[in-house]
Curated annotation (Swiss-Prot):
Keywords: Cytoplasm, GTP-binding, Hydrolase, Magnesium, Metal-binding, Nucleotide-binding. It comes from the Bacteria. Its EC number is 3.6.5.-. An essential GTPase which binds GTP, GDP and possibly (p)ppGpp with moderate affinity, with high nucleotide exchange rates and a fairly low GTP hydrolysis rate. Plays a role in control of the cell cycle, stress response, ribosome biogenesis and in those bacteria that undergo differentiation, in morphogenesis control. The gene is obg. Residues 1-159 form the Obg domain. It comes from Pelodictyon phaeoclathratiforme (strain DSM 5477 / BU-1). Mg(2+) binds at S173, T193. Its cofactor is Mg(2+). GTP binds at residues 166-173, 191-195, 213-216, 280-283, 304-306. Monomer. InterPro entries: G_OBG, GTP-bd, GTP-bd_Obg/CgtA, GTP1-OBG_CS, GTP1_OBG_dom, GTP1_OBG_dom_sf, OBG_GTPase, P-loop_NTPase. Residues 160-323 form the OBG-type G domain. This is GTPase Obg.
Length: 337
């Protein structure tokens, strides 16, 4: 499936139905009063998150979403039926902006979250509402109000707990394929990963976390080189970054600081996230390899996705960080105090 993380759509809520001009006509009531019913409300347009969706691909093919107008009022005080609502499913992590002002309308991060994005027009009132002692036979009714219409710009930031960051061929795709159910394309050449991949890592029974693998970053990514920069927003919501560096790197320390520099140029706040350095491909490492201390307080783990070396320790460390931040984000139960 093609990965699409931005799209623009046009939404138009339904117009309200017209109020009715009608007069009561019965055999023994030759001059009945006004009995025109109200028009129905136009259909609303809603956005709803769907955890099964991971891309905005659908919106490349369908760009207009128009709700049904309300039914016009009828005689005998009959109110028209409301127009049917339109519900648009989007992935969790979708940011919705007003296409004209670029103002953020919604940041949809919750599961099954719904937001009313365009309100249907109210139905017009029938002529029964306009009778007065001096005007007992009004011959007019209200038209229905127009439904809201707007252009929406949508941007997807994937919802993941752990973000994998590294140069091309650092072993990110191999790692996520080994410790999760994700099946990314893997090959021994740079830029095999062209789009982000998500994988669910099963830690223990009833415990799991989501890992995101983005295309490799190269030096100069902040100036537009390579593929990784355009996908860096997909790690902005992660709880921890795993910086992957291959054991056969010419200079592990230099590669680490280069990666941090590119992250800082893209979004300085990314450096505020906790991070872990993972030296990969230890199965092909030189026997005399010495892994330097890269930064105070930043742990360095050595792994091999091929032999399995260090994978349990890595999962333990990632789960400890992820679960700790989940607990920290939960509101305190004041009744326990």
């Amino acid at each position: 499936m093609k990965f699409v993380d931005s799209a623009s759509i046009f939404v138009h809520a339904g117009d309200g139905g017209k109020g009715c001009v009608s007069f009561r006509r019965e055999k023994f009531v030759p001059k009945g009063g006004p009995d025109g019913g109200d028009g129905g409300r136009g259909g609303h347009v809603w956005l709803r998150t769907n955890r099964q969706l991971t891309t905005l691909l659908d919106f490349k093919y369908k760009k207009k979403y128009i709700a049904v107008r309300g039914v016009h009022g009828q005689g005998a005080r009959k109110t028209g039926r409301d127009g049917a609502d339109v519900v648009i499913d989007v992935p969790c992590g979708t940011i919705v902006r007003n296409g004209e002002t670029n103002e953020i309308i919604a940041d949809l991060t919750g599961e099954d979250q719904e937001i009313l994005i365009a309100r249907g027009g109210k139905g017009g009132r029938g002529n029964q509402h306009f009778a007065t002692p001096t005007r007992q036979a009004p011959r007019y009714a209200e038209p229905g109000q127009k439904g809201e219409l707007l252009m929406l710009n949508m941007e997807l930031k994937l919802m993941a707990d752990v973000g994998l960051v590294g140069f091309p061929n650092a072993g990110k795709s191999t790692l996520i394929s080994v410790i999760s159910a994700a099946k990314p394309k893997i090959a021994d050449y740079p830029f095999t990963t062209l789009v982000p991949n998500l994988g669910i890592v099963r830690y223990e029974e009833y415990k799991s976390f989501v890992m995101a693998d983005i295309p490799g970053i190269i030096e100069g990514a902040a100036e537009g080189k390579g593929l990784g920069l355009q996908f860096l927003r997909h790690i902005e919501r992660t709880k921890i970054l795993a910086i992957l560096i291959a054991a056969d790197s010419p200079d592990i320390a230099d590669e680490y600081h280069t990666l941090l520099g590119e992250l800082e140029k893209f979004e300085k706040e990314l450096l505020d996230k906790p991070r872990l350095v993972v030296v990969t491909k230890m199965d092909i490492a030189a026997e005399d390899l010495e892994i330097p201390t890269l930064e105070e307080g930043v742990r360095v783990l050595s792994i091999s996705a091929v032999s399995g070396q260090g994978l349990k320790e890595l999962k333990d460390e990632l789960w400890r960080e992820v679960s700790g931040r989940i607990r920290a984000a939960e509101p305190l139960d004041e009744s326990l105090g």
